[in-house]
Design a protein with these regions (language model features):
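Active-site phosphate/pyrophosphate- and oxyanion-stabilizing loops and adjacent acidic/basic residues
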Residues: 14, 18, 75, 98, ...
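A short, sequence-level motif marking secondary-structure junctions
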Residues: 157-163
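Alpha-helical packing segments of well-folded alpha/beta enzyme cores
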Residues: 16, 46, 73, 212-219
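Radical SAM [4Fe-4S] cluster-binding motif and immediate context
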Residues: 8, 164-222
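Glycine-rich beta-alpha loop elements in corrinoid/cobalamin-binding modules
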Residues: 19, 33-157
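A short, flexible N-terminal coil/short beta segment enriched in small residues
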Residues: 1-22
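Signal peptide-proximal N-terminal region
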Residues: 20-30
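Conserved SAM/AdoMet-binding glycine-rich loop
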Residues: 1, 57, 83, 87, ...
Length: 222
């Protein structure tokens, strides 16, 4: 995640990690690390930290405030880590995934829309296990990806998930000290503002009220 300011945090990447870890078969060999930076950081400093981690797959979260920065970073990462698998997700790449892949030959694929279930499936593909040995990218909804022959393959959008299935991510508040906390009680929007990508998703969903009350109490008690 490359945030706009130091005080910001990226709720999306925390949700993806939490959901994937909760739903991962025991014999899938995947270790998920989060890395948050800001658009104000030195680019070489970020590139150095990414390289130091030596990840086999890197996923970037793309928004209107960081898209140019992220695209440039993707190009740089691929120069120094030629074999790394790179995926992108977020609202700024979801609705023009084919164009994004055409613009960025360094990308392996794009996750479209909400990413919890999609990211978990990708982890299972790349971390093969006895349960998922037959799973392939061609079977995963919610992605557009580059096939081995260079063609671009687009899968259908994923059916919106039950928001109550997303794990609560704020168990350790120390890592969010002096930062803004983002909490999600709903997804989708009933309005049609022309300037906002949220208007594209007409499926308005809410997190279970009982769960919301318990989680908000956690914040007030902390």
């Amino acid at each position: 995640a490359i945030n706009a300011k130091y005080i910001h945090s990226n709720l999306a990447v925390y949700c993806l990690k939490a959901y994937a870890e909760k739903n991962m078969p025991q014999d899938v060999n995947v270790q998920i690390e989060l890395a948050e930076y800001t658009i104000n950081q030195n680019r070489d400093e970020i590139l150095k930290d990414i390289y130091r981690r030596q990840a086999e797959m890197i996923c970037f979260s793309c928004y209107i405030w960081n898209l140019d920065y992220v695209e440039s970073m993707i190009r740089d990462v691929k120069k120094v880590m030629k074999d790394v698998i790179i995926w992108a997700g977020g609202p700024e790449v979801s609705y023009d995934s084919r164009e994004t892949l055409g613009r960025l030959p360094e990308l392996t694929g794009v996750m479209k829309g909400e990413g919890e279930k999609t990211f978990a499936k990708l982890c299972k593909v790349y971390g093969k296990s006895s349960e998922t040995s037959e799973l392939s990218l061609e079977q995963i909804d919610g992605i557009t990806f580059r096939c081995p022959d260079g063609t671009i393959c687009e899968r259908p959008w994923r059916v919106p998930m039950d928001l109550s299935e997303v794990p609560f991510v704020y168990h350790d508040m120390k890592k969010f000290e002096n930062k803004i906390i983002y909490y999600e009680t709903s997804r989708g929007c009933p309005f049609s503002c022309s300037y906002c990508l949220s208007s594209v998703d007409k499926t308005l969903r809410f997190r279970d009220t009982g769960i919301v009350k318990r989680e908000l109490k956690f914040f007030t008690d902390s």
